[in-house]
């Protein structure tokens, strides 16, 4: 085929919206080869301005989209790169379960930091529902897909004039992080933690080697490329195991597996989901307390923004579990160990910017579950809880500022050489916000696969009041009087006794199914027997719920059976707007909240007043 004909076909494909990657797949080529060919043929995107003022007067803060509409390039491109120093921030793209609006918070704070430093802030994002894509947030906005092709196109265009200092990938969630190495190989400077160190944290085998070298405990595990390897690893470390594909966000395709049959079934599903990456198998630490830590590092000094204790048990995805700052049940030696491990990891990975580390504590041993060399979904929560803008600090560090200088204005405590931790003034609780009302038929039970799409915060002087506020913020108003229905799986029956006892003391009337009612009565707690759905199709718990006689539902899942009684009860609670709880730790926290509200007032602050109190201004 002659070059003119090739040029005509390739241009037509680009006009129709085919990406370089799609064209490469169709032709059996590499994406870079298609890119090089396209550029050789002078098929280059131009950027058109969206006039935010509708031609009424000149747009001062325009934003752009790409188009392939002509061979004439320079005359029709409207992006007009400035001659300033500039930085590109990659946004997080569409909101979906696992990657939500929380990441946009970090992108916006990065823009604010760059503006304070006199550097032009350029955002690439394609989600109109975010603050970062408001045309007056950044100096320049490119409304483009978060892909290697589009980011590199924009970087090359902006390099033509002024000084492009680099690209920030830390604030765009996993989508942006996955582009780091390819962009570096294409000659783009990645600001902050290097792509090699990002990979050392993201690649499970590399990270496992690092933990061994640092003498930091980790849950036993392995990487399987076949069903046979998976069965062998699970047999070696013992069931239950947590299985998941590599490189995921939001716990997609993640599952706790209790037997060989379950594992075989999972492998047949997950390997199809994840052909490019192997399946990871870890020992599941039952009844462990999970922790999250958000930290900022300049390669040497470390600031720990907060240690967050998960309220739900291990096995509930970190994005779905309620968390509390400061930790409520951990002894000082555990806190000290977590601080030590976080600082060691930050330095070993040479983190420049943000780091999130997830831990599990079992039998006094602190295990590292994973480290994420990027902004986590908890950065807004931590920043608001302790009054320190972590994303802002991280951005300034990426551009050469030293952490020790930046934290002088904040209330932090030095806990080791070049290690500080923020001092929270209040109890702050994050609660997940779920979309179940908009998803008919979905079981609201919590597990390792993430289901939430947002989060809310409750802040007060003690745990109970803060938890009550967090539930209110997440659209779940806990009752302080009324009827409670309790039905829990066998392994939870001994743990529900204290919860039921407290609810009875607080004046609630308890309804329960046969097995749960028997255990409660044996422990001196009166319970009204309610028939299961399968026992009586017309006179059962669902009828009581529909008649408005139930004010709180406590129901834990009994297993994998898709349409169990528990499923119908939980689903009815969602549809009828009845507060429901699906974990024992969640039930214990709710009881503390109800007791706190029954015995005292909730503290009420304006946002300005609360912000000033958190920052120690009065």
From Swiss-Prot:
Residues 478-618 are annotated as: Allosteric domain. SMART domains: CPSase_L_D3, MGS. Keywords: Amino-acid biosynthesis, Arginine biosynthesis, ATP-binding, Ligase, Magnesium, Manganese, Metal-binding, Nucleotide-binding, Pyrimidine biosynthesis, Repeat. One of its GO terms (biological process) is 'de novo' UMP biosynthetic process. Pfam families: CPSase_L_D2 (PF02786), MGS (PF02142). Residues 476-618 form the MGS-like domain. Its EC number is 6.3.4.16, 6.3.5.5. It catalyses: hydrogencarbonate + L-glutamine + 2 ATP + H2O = carbamoyl phosphate + L-glutamate + 2 ADP + phosphate + 2 H(+); hydrogencarbonate + NH4(+) + 2 ATP = carbamoyl phosphate + 2 ADP + phosphate + 2 H(+). Its cofactor is Mg(2+); Mn(2+). Binds 2 Mg(2+) or Mn(2+) ions per subunit. Residues 1-78 are annotated as: Oligomerization domain. InterPro entries: ATP-grasp, ATP_grasp_subdomain_1, CarbamoylP_synth_lsu_oligo, CarbamoylP_synth_lsu_oligo_sf, CbamoylP_synth_lsu-like_ATP-bd, CbamoylP_synth_lsu_CPSase_dom, MGS-like_dom, MGS-like_dom_sf. CDD domains: MGS_CPS_II. Mg(2+) 2 binds at residues 370, 372. Mn(2+) 2 binds at residues 370, 372. The keyword Signal does not apply. Pathway: Amino-acid biosynthesis; L-arginine biosynthesis; carbamoyl phosphate from bicarbonate: step 1/1; Pyrimidine metabolism; UMP biosynthesis via de novo pathway; (S)-dihydroorotate from bicarbonate: step 1/3. Corresponds to the C-terminal section. The large subunit is composed of 2 ATP-grasp domains that are involved in binding the 2 ATP molecules needed for carbamoyl phosphate synthesis. The N-terminal ATP-grasp domain (referred to as the carboxyphosphate synthetic component) catalyzes the ATP-dependent phosphorylation of hydrogencarbonate to carboxyphosphate and the subsequent nucleophilic attack by ammonia to form a carbamate intermediate. Composed of two chains; the small (or glutamine) chain promotes the hydrolysis of glutamine to ammonia, which is used by the large (or ammonia) chain to synthesize carbamoyl phosphate. Tetramer of heterodimers (alpha,beta)4. This is Carbamoyl phosphate synthase large chain, C-terminal section. It comes from Methanocaldococcus jannaschii (strain ATCC 43067 / DSM 2661 / JAL-1 / JCM 10045 / NBRC 100440) (Methanococcus jannaschii).
